[in-house]
């Protein structure tokens, strides 16, 4: 089915104007009509400031209604929403503002200090729209985001296909902007979206609106506990709106597991997006602390790109007897290449089944997905981004034409099992995946080497029961006994996002590199886990 999120949301708002669209717990509710009008007013504000089709609008916010209003408003005029990581430091934000050619930055007042520094580093004019998530003065030259509320809504016009960017986590260098077509994303989502809701596949926009406004349909209430800048969280909430459901937003910026459990109960949440164990474990523990024995209304939980252990899934199935957990093997650049679906404890241990369009390639780039025991890189031939923005070389390297089909090869190594299942072996690189955030070792090493007295450094991940992996480092200095490891970690934290700071550090006099400059990573990782210190 062809369609555009903007058009469909507008039609749903006309057909069911009074249904809740976005509920901020304990604060406010936007109905479908109010959300539609807010998006139209924000679109008018953008146009007033010279923003048009294909112009880039960066969004640097925690999960808030304004995030979704900005996203929807961009789609209405063909502007390109560019979600940014609110954990980034000024230099990282400036680099992405520059890389994306953003002309507008929507940001939270709580992030104003880092934004001011980032904008100064960009060194070119940007339209700044400040969301008052905390009481704070506007940055010089900034506009209050709430000003859009006094604009006349931009009249609706049928949307023409546009784009939105999702930045990679930087597994092979600096983050890259994957350019997703809006209509392409919708067509990719339709199959899993409607089947997971127990609905027939729509053949037309009329079908979408009819099912979204059917009074007899089971209500869809979605809560994303991972940030909207991540693909799984974003698609969870925008697809809930497409089904005629509502999105629940927590009022606090920081993840609060107890508040999340209370919201699931009080707001009758039916589906939740998480980042594996990093969020799911505190969620289960919070339910225990609150004396909540069962979450019967919770029917779906989705997670992607993060360790999600069977022991955690077992606890979740016991807590939520009607829950279907979908563990998604995916990358920013491609669709879901594998799904680990469990409906009860009986389905454990969970296994990844390859999705249609997924293949496994050996070193010669030949397909081996039909050969049990074969090891290779998993690849996807279905819907995928148009490429990386302004990076034709990396686009050509990662989006490969093979046997007449375009393939995205994200680099994950798998072992082929029987009946279409695969076992994930690793990322095929030294990237650290911590809580769903990908951390490129080179940038952390660079920060470590800027600390006085550090002669050499290597960064890698070590296993962690909650986050999957945490950043660890081995550093060389002439006098190991004199090194202040806590100060070293804080030094990194002043230059990079907090989650990139080393959580385990081994201090030595020499890294004992080989003549070619390499270290035995397996040995170093084991030594650091056993002998390293926690800052």
Q: What is each stretch, according to the model?
A:
Residues 88, 107, 386-387, 397-398, ...:
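AMP-binding/adenylate-forming catalytic core of the ANL superfamily
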Residues 366-400, 437-439:
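Conserved ATP/PPi-binding loop(s) of AMP-dependent carboxylate-activating enzymes
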Residues 21-50, 55-64, 89-94:
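Conserved AMP-binding/adenylate-forming core of the ANL superfamily
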Residues 188-224, 229-271:
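Conserved AMP-binding/adenylation subdomain of ANL enzymes
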Residues 170, 243-245, 270-274, 285-349, ...:
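Gly/Ser/Thr-rich phosphate-binding loop
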């Amino acid at each position: 089915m062809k369609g555009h999120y903007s058009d469909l949301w507008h039609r749903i708002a006309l057909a069911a104007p009074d249904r809740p669209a976005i509920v901020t717990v304990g604060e406010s509710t936007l109905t479908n009509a109010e959300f539609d009008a807010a998006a139209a007013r924000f679109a008018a504000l953008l146009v007033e400031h010279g923003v048009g089709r294909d112009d880039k609008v960066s969004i640097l916010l925690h999960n808030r209604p304004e995030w979704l209003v900005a996203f929807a408003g961009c789609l209405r005029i063909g502007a390109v929403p560019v979600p940014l990581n609110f954990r980034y430091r000024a230099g990282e934000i400036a680099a992405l503002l520059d890389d994306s050619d953003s002309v507008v930055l929507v940001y939270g007042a709580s992030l104003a200090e880092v934004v001011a520094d980032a904008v100064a580093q960009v060194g070119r004019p940007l339209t700044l729209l400040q969301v008052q998530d905390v009481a704070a003065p506007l940055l010089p030259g900034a506009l209050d985001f709430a000003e859009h509320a006094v604009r006349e809504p931009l009249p609706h016009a049928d949307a023409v296909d546009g784009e939105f960017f999702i930045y990679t986590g930087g597994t092979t260098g600096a983050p890259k902007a994957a350019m997703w077509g809006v209509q392409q994303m919708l067509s990719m989502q339709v199959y899993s979206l409607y089947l997971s809701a127990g609905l027939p596949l729509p053949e037309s926009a009329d079908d979408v609106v009819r099912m979204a406004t059917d009074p007899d349909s089971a209500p869809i209430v979605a809560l994303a506990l991972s940030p909207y800048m991540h693909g799984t969280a974003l698609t969870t909430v925008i697809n809930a709106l497409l089904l005629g459901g509502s999105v629940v937003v927590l009022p606090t910026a920081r993840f609060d597991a107890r508040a999340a459990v209370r919201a699931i109960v009080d707001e009758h949440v039916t589906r939740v997006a998480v980042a594996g164990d990093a969020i799911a474990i505190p969620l289960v523990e919070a339910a225990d602390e609150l004396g909540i024995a069962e979450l019967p209304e919770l029917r779906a939980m989705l997670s992607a790109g993060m360790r999600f252990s069977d022991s955690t899934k077992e606890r979740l199935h016991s807590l939520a007897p009607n829950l279907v957990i979908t563990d998604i093997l995916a990358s920013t650049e491609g669709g879901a290449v594998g799904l680990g679906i469990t409906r009860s404890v009986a389905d454990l241990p969970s296994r990844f089944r390859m999705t249609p369009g997924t293949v496994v390639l050996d070193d010669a780039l030949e397909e081996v997905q039909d050969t049990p025991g074969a090891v290779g890189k998993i690849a996807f031939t279905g819907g995928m981004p148009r490429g990386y923005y302004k990076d034709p070389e990396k686009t050509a390297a990662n989006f490969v034409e093979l046997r007449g089909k375009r393939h995205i090869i994200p680099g994950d190594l798998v072992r082929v099992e029987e009946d279409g299942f695969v076992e994930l072996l690793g990322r095929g690189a030294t990237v650290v995946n911590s809580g769903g955030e990908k951390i490129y070792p080179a940038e952390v090493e660079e920060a470590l080497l800027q600390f006085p007295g550090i002669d050499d450094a290597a960064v890698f991940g070590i296993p962690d029961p909650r986050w999957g992996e945490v950043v660890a480092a081995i550093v060389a200095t002439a006098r190991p006994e004199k090194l202040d490891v806590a100060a070293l970690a804080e030094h990194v934290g002043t230059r990079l996002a907090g989650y990139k700071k080393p959580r385990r550090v081994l201090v030595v006099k020499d890294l004992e590199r080989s003549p070619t400059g390499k270290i035995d990573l397996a040995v170093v990782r084991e030594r650091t886990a056993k002998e390293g210190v926690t800052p």
